[in-house]
Regions:
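Predominantly extracellular/luminal cell-surface or secreted proteins
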Residues: 40, 54-62, 98-104
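Sec-dependent bacterial lipoprotein signal peptides
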Residues: 1-22
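Short Pro-Gly-centered beta-turn/loop motif in secreted/extracellular proteins
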Residues: 83-96, 100-106
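Short, ordered, surface-exposed loop/turn motifs in non-cytosolic proteins
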Residues: 44-70
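Structured interaction patches on ligand/partner-binding surfaces of diverse proteins
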Residues: 103-151
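Short, low-complexity, Pro/Ser/Thr/Gly-rich segments in the mature regions of secreted, periplasmic
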Residues: 148-162
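Bacterial Sec-dependent N-terminal signal peptides
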Residues: 16-42, 158-162
Length: 162
């Protein structure tokens, strides 16, 4: 009888150790960033019938190529004047600009075929070079930004061709 008690006690202790060792540790450090985005659209009824609207994230500004991350927005996503998005799995890095823009389908010139609807900060007068950069890191892995946007189809003048 003594052996049965010892084996039962040993089995119970082994089971408890197994259960404790399988506990999920939710304090694992983050390995990528998450950006929660709210786009407040002043005039959602002015959504263009043609062209493409983008929400884009750039690491550098002015951009020197394609955005780091970009999604196409649809007018059906607007709810009470707001579009909510989440960009996940972002590199731990510094980002220069979060923007919303409309691409003119009739203008193939990338230097002047987009109308900026809004950015997370910065001004059109400085062509958004004064936007405040933001950084993702293990200590700062989730951010929320708000973009105030005005739907428009006014693109900048194209530079003269030589």
């Amino acid at each position: 009888m003594n052996i049965i008690k010892k084996l039962s006690l040993l089995s119970l202790i082994a089971s408890m150790l197994f259960l404790v060792s399988c506990d999920d540790d939710s304090s694992d450090p983050a390995t990528s960033g998450t950006l929660n985005i709210s786009i407040n659209l002043t005039n959602p009824d002015s959504w263009p019938a043609e062209g493409t609207v983008f929400c884009s994230l750039d690491k550098t500004w002015p951009p020197s190529g394609a955005p780091y991350k970009s999604v196409v927005l649809q007018s059906a996503q607007v709810s009470n004047g707001t579009i909510s998005l989440v960009f996940e799995d972002l590199d731990f890095d510094t980002y220069a600009l979060l923007s919303v823009s409309w691409l003119d389908p009739n203008n193939p010139n990338p230097a002047c075929n987009q109308a900026v609807w809004g950015t997370h900060s910065g001004s059109i007068q400085a062509f958004y070079a004064d936007a405040v950069p933001f950084t993702f890191s293990a200590e700062n892995s989730e951010l929320s930004l708000v973009v105030g946007a005005v739907a428009n189809t006014v693109t900048p003048d194209c530079p003269p061709t030589g």
